[in-house]
């Protein structure tokens, strides 16, 4: 074998490997564009993006030309991709509205994005006032642009928008205001030559470079070279939407996201270098985009008006706020420019994330219990002797089963005589009358199918009895036993004028439901945590949302008077670590409380603050640190879980989440003790 052939083999292998990786990255475009098509079908007929969103106006459909098939994604994916569309388009509009100059928009890794046709279409009232000063350059892999160009050439509606095209170009589209230019972004000399050939150096022409999850698949050095090259042109803006991992690769959603892209042979390479918003801001400043505004996607969500939020809530039923929090904290939108005089639109000018102080460590420790394959979430449970009875929940489909979990024997048994009246999630299930009967309240099927029923399960006869129908449906409410025959219920519906109820059991077939007095400042919430401390006669509530977007950052301690059935606020404490949706709270001593899990609109929780203790006497908050072998190895996702005291230990079981389109995480079982 000659030396020449020996050299050619590794070169050929390297070329084939790169070609395969390029195809995998191109494949991500197919998934993304299909999800945007779902948004176009579900959202845009009722609510557009960019300026149309705040005007509550619909958007015109353009994705249909590239994805004619009707596609339906989950509500959380739809909401996430609507927000992605809004992120890029609202930031472009903020630049367009700030100037009168001609603008060239260069889409790096454009895929099948129809953005040029949206903005150049004279029949699109959202952008028609800009169209005579806009030019577009779509850049992507040659194979992908060949397909896109073919669709454009075969679609009269698209051709009519961009006008006549150069018939001599077979692999490109060249028209007066729109071009497709194939380029491998890894080939820096070719990329720089491309930019130079487009005469982008004129200072009176504004350049907008867009990278919507396109540079993320490149080695960070190569992606940095792209950013640096773009910054050399005067009056340039760079809009980037990209993944981040704010608390590191071991956070469960982060880990699942990274594994998903690696499994699909399109690993996220820049995110391991630029994990946080702060590092992304520093990145752009280092490469001469010195004027930078960046935030995560929930900050963008919060910039929308309450009218837009209400409109979105009415588009499709939605009860996936935890998943939406997690998704939004893993994507950032960054607008950077080398124009120091540019003023960012105040409505989308993000504040830099607040850094929380480190916490002292509590004396509690977390251990994992032998895995016994329990994978349900959003159910409800009671303690029965030395076992746990878990009802309903989903895995992934809603269940009507009751399971007995025996931790000593590491067994799970489904009780055939205890099947629930209906499959449900987000209900409450409590034991009263010395364990002789259990009470099931509310919950839901789908988000638009909530329950308002109350059932009692009489253990001696193993039968369910419907004992009441509430005036309104409730789910994601919180309950605590006040006495042997009385239950306190909080929230479960945004519209309640009286957020607390007591439910008193009179017999196996009769209950009395009463609203109780509480201060007007206490609003009904869903997803709040509550516990009752019998020794101090205190009711504690924490977090929750009263409107589906905002989450309370308060822990409120109230004294309960049984005779007058009145709650009186004793203490109200505000802290960012109390801003949780879907958390649980349990009292450890008269003064100390354990707060576990949930999600926040402001941040991702990590190994040091996912679980905390609060002392009501000293107001001290301590960390119940999740040990490395659990945090790094188990994907502990404190969403949709249950929390119970059993044999002197606190038990965390059930729970997990669907991590957007990246797969699901299910928890093992854990104990907390001194």
Curated annotation (Swiss-Prot):
InterPro entries on file: Gal_Oxase/kelch_b-propeller (IPR011043), Kelch-typ_b-propeller (IPR015915), Ppm1/Ppm2/Tcmp (IPR007213), SAM-dependent_MTases_sf (IPR029063)
Residues involved in S-adenosyl-L-methionine binding: 84, 109, 140, 184-185, 212
Keywords from the named record: Methyltransferase, S-adenosyl-L-methionine, Transferase, tRNA processing
Catalytic activity of the protein: 7-[(3S)-3-amino-3-carboxypropyl]wyosine(37) in tRNA(Phe) + S-adenosyl-L-methionine = 7-[(3S)-(3-amino-3-methoxycarbonyl)propyl]wyosine(37) in tRNA(Phe) + S-adenosyl-L-homocysteine; 7-[(3S)-(3-amino-3-methoxycarbonyl)propyl]wyosine(37) in tRNA(Phe) + S-adenosyl-L-methionine + CO2 = wybutosine(37) in tRNA(Phe) + S-adenosyl-L-homocysteine + 2 H(+)
Identification of the protein by name: tRNA wybutosine-synthesizing protein 4
Family of the protein in this entry: Belongs to the methyltransferase superfamily. LCMT family.
One GO process term, biological-process aspect: tRNA methylation
Purpose of the protein: Probable S-adenosyl-L-methionine-dependent methyltransferase that acts as a component of the wybutosine biosynthesis pathway. Wybutosine is a hyper modified guanosine with a tricyclic base found at the 3'-position adjacent to the anticodon of eukaryotic phenylalanine tRNA. May methylate the carboxyl group of leucine residues to form alpha-leucine ester residues.
GO MF term (any one): tRNA methyltransferase activity
Enzyme Commission number(s): 2.1.1.290, 2.3.1.231
């Amino acid at each position: 074998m000659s030396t020449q052939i020996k050299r050619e083999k590794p070169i050929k292998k390297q070329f084939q490997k790169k070609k395969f990786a390029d195809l995998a990255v191109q494949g991500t475009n197919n998934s993304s564009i299909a999800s945007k098509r779902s948004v176009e079908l579900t959202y845009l007929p009722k609510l557009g993006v960019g300026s149309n969103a705040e005007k509550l106006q619909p958007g015109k459909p353009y994705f249909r030309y590239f994805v004619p098939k009707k596609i339906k994604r989950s509500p959380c994916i739809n909401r996430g991709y609507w927000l992605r569309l809004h992120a890029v388009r609202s930031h472009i509009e903020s630049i367009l509205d700030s100037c009168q100059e001609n603008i060239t928009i260069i889409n790096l890794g454009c895929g099948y994005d129809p953005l040029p046709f949206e903005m150049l279409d004279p029949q699109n009232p959202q952008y028609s006032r800009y169209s005579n000063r806009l030019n577009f350059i779509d850049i992507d892999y040659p194979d992908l642009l060949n397909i896109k160009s073919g669709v454009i050439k075969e679609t009269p509606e698209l051709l009519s928008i961009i006008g006549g095209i150069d018939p001599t170009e077979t692999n490109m589209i060249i028209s007066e205001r729109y071009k497709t230019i194939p380029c491998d972004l890894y080939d820096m000399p070719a990329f720089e030559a491309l930019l130079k050939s487009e005469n982008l150096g004129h200072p009176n022409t504004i350049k907008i470079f867009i990278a919507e999850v396109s540079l993320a698949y490149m080695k960070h050095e190569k992606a940095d070279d792209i950013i640096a090259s773009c910054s050399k042109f005067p009056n340039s803006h760079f809009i980037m939407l990209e993944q981040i991992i704010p608390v590191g690769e071991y956070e469960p959603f982060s880990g699942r996201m990274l594994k998903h892209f690696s499994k699909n042979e399109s690993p996220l390479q820049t995110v391991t270098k630029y994990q946080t918003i702060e590092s992304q801001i520093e990145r752009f400043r280092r490469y001469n985009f010195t004027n930078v505004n960046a935030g995560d996607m929930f900050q963008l969500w919060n910039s929308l008006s309450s009218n837009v939020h209400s409109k979105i809530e009415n588009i499709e039923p939605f009860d996936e706020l935890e998943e939406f929090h997690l998704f939004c904290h893993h994507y950032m939108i960054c607008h950077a420019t080398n124009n120091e005089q540019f003023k960012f639109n105040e409505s989308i000018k993000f504040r830099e994330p607040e850094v929380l102080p480190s916490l002292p460590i509590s004396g509690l420790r977390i251990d994992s219990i032998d895995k016994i394959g329990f994978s349900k979430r959003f159910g409800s449970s009671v303690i029965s002797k030395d076992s746990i009875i878990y009802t309903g929940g989903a895995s992934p489909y809603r269940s009507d089963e009751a399971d007995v979990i025996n931790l000593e024997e590491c067994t799970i048994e489904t009780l055939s005589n205890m099947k629930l009246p209906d499959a449900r999630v987000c209900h409450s299930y409590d034991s009263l009358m010395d364990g002789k009967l259990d009470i099931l309240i509310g919950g839901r099927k789908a988000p638009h199918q909530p329950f308002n029923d109350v059932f009692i399960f009489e253990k001696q006869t193993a039968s369910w009895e419907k004992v009441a129908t509430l005036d309104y449906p409730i789910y994601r409410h919180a309950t605590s036993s006040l006495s042997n025959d009385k239950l306190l219920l909080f929230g479960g519906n945004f519209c309640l004028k009286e957020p607390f109820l007591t439910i008193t059991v009179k017999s196996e077939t009769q209950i009395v439901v009463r609203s109780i007095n509480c201060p007007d400042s206490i609003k009904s919430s869903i997803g709040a945590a509550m516990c009752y401390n019998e020794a101090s006669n205190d009711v504690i509530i924490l977090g929750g949302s009263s409107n589906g977007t905002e989450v309370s950052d308060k822990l409120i301690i109230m004294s309960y008077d049984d005779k007058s059935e009145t709650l009186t606020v004793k203490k109200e404490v505000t802290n960012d670590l109390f801003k949780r949706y879907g958390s649980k709270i349990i009292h450890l001593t008269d003064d100390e409380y354990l707060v576990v899990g949930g999600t926040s609109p402001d941040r991702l929780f990590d190994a040091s603050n996912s679980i905390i203790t609060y002392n009501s006497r000293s107001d001290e908050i301590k960390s119940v640190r999740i040990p490395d072998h659990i945090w790094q190895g188990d994907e502990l996702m404190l969403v949709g879980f249950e929390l119970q005291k059993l044999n002197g230990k606190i038990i965390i079981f059930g729970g997990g989440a669907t991590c957007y389109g990246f797969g699901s995480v299910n928890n093992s079982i854990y104990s907390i003790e001194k």
